[in-house]
Structures are given as structure tokens and as C-alpha cells.
Amino acid sequence: MLTRKELLLQHTNRNDIIMRKLKITELNRISIEEFKEADKLPLVVVLDDIRSLHNIGSVFRTADAFRIECIYLCGITATPPHPEMHKTALGAEFTVDWKYVNNAVETVDNLRSEGYVVYSVEQAEGSIMLDELTLDRSKKYAV
């Protein structure tokens, strides 16, 4: 039977290093205020009728990592604060700007009129793979 240390060593690239997950206090993150003022990726996310609080929290966490502009929460999609959402958002619901809007279709139309290029993310007939997508860095996007 392998020890925990031996198991960890087997799953690292170098046998002399044990990888350890950093604590939030060790990440040297900027403050919420600094995050709000920081440059953002010209991308917004529109979530429509998402039931899973964990999925919503995960989108917040990803949005925080990529410093996206905003998340639009539409329809029955829950809004912060919520303890179940916080479990996966890990505080990103405080850093990422978000807005609740009832109607996703109107929101997408408004974003389009503001110059956003809109893409839908779905596994569907006729869709393209993400690695085949080419983005123009001079444009703003909504997904």
C-alpha cells in the first residue's frame, strides 16, 4: 500500500516536488476594489434559466479568472448571494460584475446593438469546435 506522499509523488512531473494547493491567502490576489478597476477581457456571459447553483458559481469563478466584464443572469437563474453558489464561486460573486435581467433574448439583442459579437455555446448540429473558433481581439464578445 502506497503512502499519501508516494501517491502524490507519482502524480507530479518531478519526483522531488509535492504539489500543494495554495490557500486563498497565499494567492496574492488583488483586492475587490482593485479587481473592479482592473482592465477586463471584452467578454460578457449570458446565463439563461440555469438551475444548478454550482454551475452558476463555477461560471463566476471562471469569469473571475479571466477578468470578464460582466455576467447577465436571466430568467430563473439564481443571483448572489446564495450559500450553494458560494461553494463553487469561492468569492468570485463579489469581484465579477453581474446583472439580473428577466429576458435573455432582449439582453442579447441589446448587447448586439452595443457592438458585441454574439456566440451561443451548445452541442448542436452545425456547431463548430471551440478550437476552430478564431476571435478578433479588436471586438467585444457575448456568449
PLM features: what roles do these ranges have?
Residues 1-143:
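Post-transcriptional modification and biogenesis factors for structured RNAs
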